[in-house]
Every structure is written in structure tokens, then in C-alpha cells.
Amino acid sequence: MVEKKLTGYPSVDKPWLKYYTDEAINAKIPECTIYQNIYNHNKDYPNDAALLFFEKKISYRQLFAEVEKVEKAFIAQGVKRGDNVALCVPATPEAIYTILALNKIGANANMLNPTFTEQQLTDRINETEASVMFVVNELYSRVEKIIPNTCIKTVITCAAVNSLGPIVKLIKKAKNIPNTLSWGKFLASGRNASTSADVSYQENVPAIMVYSSGTTGASKGIQLTNNSINATITQYEYTGFKLARQDRYFAQIPIWFSTGICVTMLVPLCLGVTVILEPIYDFEIFYQHISKYKPNFMVTAVGLVDYLRNKKEIDPAYKEFKYLVIGGEYVVPHAESVFNEWLKKNGSESQLHKGYGMCECGGTITSTNAVSNKFGTAGIPMAQVVVSAFDLETGEELTYGNRGELRVLSPCKMSGYYKHPEATAKYFKTDEQGRTWACTGDMGYVEEDGNVYVDGRISDSYVNDQGETIYLFDIERAILDVESVRQCKTVVSEIDGKQTHVAHAVFFNNKSTEEIIARIKAVCKAKLPENHYPHLIKLHEDALPVSPSGKLNTVEMKQDTENIIRVE
């Protein structure tokens, strides 16, 4: 067969397709609701474990039965197709029942981020016009004061440990919250209600809404549909991830993020993989549960992988990892080698994998896999996804190896920002061929072999006193080229009354701090313009701080200006 000649443009050549089968490339996205997709995949396996909540296994038979109870209860509360329902919940069984029940009805699950300010929560709730909210008791204090100022009429509450039975609830002293509808009474209200089995599938109906962080402006609702989430499921089903029925998926990313609810929850749940629910974001608890339940799949950050290595370098559980994926940050090649050696020592046949994504694109854009796992990359586009770089000034597509804004064609993309048409129009750009590109705001490039390299956010920059635009990720990459540096993130902080860049770093303990800093100076002088030098370095002992989303906590780092080392 004659090899196809490359044009030089990734969107035309799609060189990553050589890593995929025809089945993956041409896989049909199911035209049904998310619930129907999950049901169709698992109706013949009623005894398989769908969820694992601490030590309690929940079968698909029980899952579907509970979803029907919750569906009837919401119908009794007046929830109907097209309604928005606010959820302020971590990953508990009741949260999953609720999301799927609302999907059966045709309602939209609005996943509120409990770390939002009271004003953010108030604004986001009111713009949805939701009359019903579901919140776990443990997060009720986050919304208690704002509820009178919102459109919410009915508040359903439930202890996070509700599914663990009466003895555990007694030990945890779970109490009903006054002036709310307890979970038990909520379910009781629907006993005589009929289900919504006659609700037919419609294309691009809103299904789940997550929210942007709001760190660079007002948070916005990111509207995902049945089609977009089913497309995400399809990408994972056919693209070589080897998700085998009754494998175990460690779901530690909060479900109010797209990656948390779509990639680490609905994808494995649909494909018959048992989801290990983790309602509390705590590294020590994560280690205990990984050691105990021995998951095969996990998407996480460098910080947790480092924690596991340092906590207990050798553990029988680590051998079971088929796909240990780091997303949301660059993994330096020498650190990747260390992680691979660690997995090998534990008897795992897998290597560390990397991925890149964003909420607006359903969670995953690129990923490494069994046939393509190159050091330093964010992987290749998923089988039905296209990625290319575009010139920041002209908006023209760039050829291989040229850096620009990464833009994405994906069936997993959001339908838009909720009630923000201007922001939606800015995010999506339609080209002359009628293709709608998602403009990620990330700087990067694509190589001839199909691998995607992500440098960082274009906005991750500032203008210095000399009027120069300094991209912080360029400083990070230079520092990370020093093999004794394990992690690095550069942020802008106010130091001595002016804005300047500070490099936050974690070192391997193979050399003295003085030796490593001297090496950083030498490497940065060879690779960076003088005004880009990292003259201020903040060292962290174990790992850089991580936010509940699993991403690096840049807000905390910007505020942390104590004990900074000045490098002349």
C-alpha cells in the first residue's frame, strides 16, 4: 500500500489515525440518553458490581432499581423534561442515582461546585431557575444561607453515608436537617408516581451542566448533552483502553468537574467497570482505598502519584494498575521514567499514561495509549477528535511543529455556555469548510507522528516592566529540563510591591539544593531571554499543592510568598 503523503496540516492528514482501528475511527455514537446507553450495555449483567462505596457493592440490578425510585420521586416533586435541578454533592450512590434519574426524565443535572463563593452559588442557581436542589448533609452549610435568596423551593438532603446502612449512620451521627426533605421522605413521596418511560430521545438535549472555575471572570455553565457524553463513552469504548468488564476504576476527581462525572464515572459505569466512589478528597484516604480495593484505572495528578510512592513504594495494589493516567499538568520525561520504574518494581505491566482535556470538550481531548506513549507529550487525539495549532494573530492553521493556539474538533464538545451566547460565540470558531473548532486558549503544537504537545494556557503570561509578554510555561519547561527537578509551576505574585514571576518547585533528593539551583541557573541562561530568568524560587517539600479538581492549585501558590529563595 502506498503511504499517504503528508500535506503538513494536522486537520487534513490526521496522522494519529494510524494508531486506531477502522472500528474505532468509524464507531457510531449511540442516539439515546445516557441512561439508556448505560442500561443497554449492562442489562444482561444484573449481578455485576456497578459501584463500590467503601465496602458496599451495588449491582447493576440495584442501580437500575434505585434510579427508578429516584425518578418517580422527582416526578412527584414536579420535575419534568427540560427542568434544571441543582446538585451540591460529592460522589455518593445517591448522587449517581439522581443524575441518572434526571436523565431518564429529560431534566438537566446542574453540578454546583461547593468551593464557589456564596455569591457565585447564588448567581449560578438563579440563572437556571431551578426549583429543586439536592445537597448532602455535609455540604448543606455551603448553601444554607443563600437558599432564601434563590429560586429554590424544595431542598432534598441526604447523609453522605446513607447507603452504608443504619449502623454506620448511627456511628456517624447522621441527622435530618430541619426545613428540608430527607432522602427517605423524598423517596416515599414517589411511591405512587408513574415513571417517565415514555420520554423519547431527542438530539442534543441538555443532560449535565458543570461550571468553569470563575478564576478569570464569572463562572459559566458548561452544557453537556446526551450526545456529547455518549460520544465520550464511545471514544473510550473503541480506542484501545482495554476497559474490561468488572475491572475497577478509582474515581477520585470530584463529579462537579467534567472529567469527574464523564470520564471517571459515566464511562466506566457504562462499560461494566466497577466505579470506586470517593466522596472525600484526601490523599491518605486515597492511599488506603487503593491499597484495599486495588483499582485498575485512575486519572489523577503528579501529586497523588508521588504521595503513593513516598507513602509505600511497594504495594501489591500497584501491580493492578492497567492505566494510571496523569492529566492537567505536564509530566517531565525524567519524572515519567521514575514513575515507570516504580510501576515496574511493583510488577505492573503498564507504564504511566498522560492526557489532556477540558470541561468544554467533555473531559478528554488527547491521551496516550498502549500503542502510542511518547515521553513529553499529552498523547494523540482520541479517534474521532481532531487537534491542530492556529496562529495567534492570523487565525490560520499551522503546520507540524509550529506553536499556536490549540483548537479542537470533537463530538464530545459542549453545546455552549449556559445563557452566555457571546462567550459561546467566542469559544467556537467556524472555518470555511463549516467545521466548528473549540478554541482551547492553550498554547501547543502537533508533530508529524500525531502527538500533541501542550505548553500551557496562553493567558498564563504577564507583561513585565519592559513591556514584554512572558509566558510562564516557557520558564517551567526550562526548569523542568533539570533532571533533579520533579515538579515546577511558575506563577505571578506581588513581591516588593510589583508583579513578578515566581517558580514553585519540588526537587528530587539526589543532590543538594545549592547544586540544583546552580544547574537551573545554567539551563535557564542557555534557553531563556534574560528577562525570563527565574530569579525567585519557592521550594515545596513533597509536592506542589493540588486543588480538589486534581489540577495544581495556582491560587494558593500565588499567595504563598514566604521563604522565597532569591537567585542572582
What are these language model-derived features?
Residues N296-T300, R309-K374, V386:
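Gly/Ser/Thr-rich phosphate-binding loop
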Residues F64-K69, I222-A244, Q252, V305, ...:
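Conserved structural elements of the adenylate-forming
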Residues I380-Q384, E396-K429, N451, E468-I470:
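Conserved ATP/PPi-binding loop(s) of AMP-dependent carboxylate-activating enzymes
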Residues K489-E494, V502-H504, K521-E568:
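Conserved C-terminal "lid"/linker of ANL adenylate-forming enzymes
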Residues N230-R248, F257-V299, Y307, K311-K312:
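Conserved AMP-binding/adenylation subdomain of ANL enzymes
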Residues K175-Y211, A218, F241-R248:
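Conserved pre-ATP/AMP-binding loop-to-beta segment of ANL
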Residues P30, N47-T92, I96-L100, T117-T122, ...:
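Conserved AMP-binding/adenylate-forming core of the ANL superfamily
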Residues A95, F116, M133, S410, ...:
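AMP-binding/adenylate-forming catalytic core of the ANL superfamily
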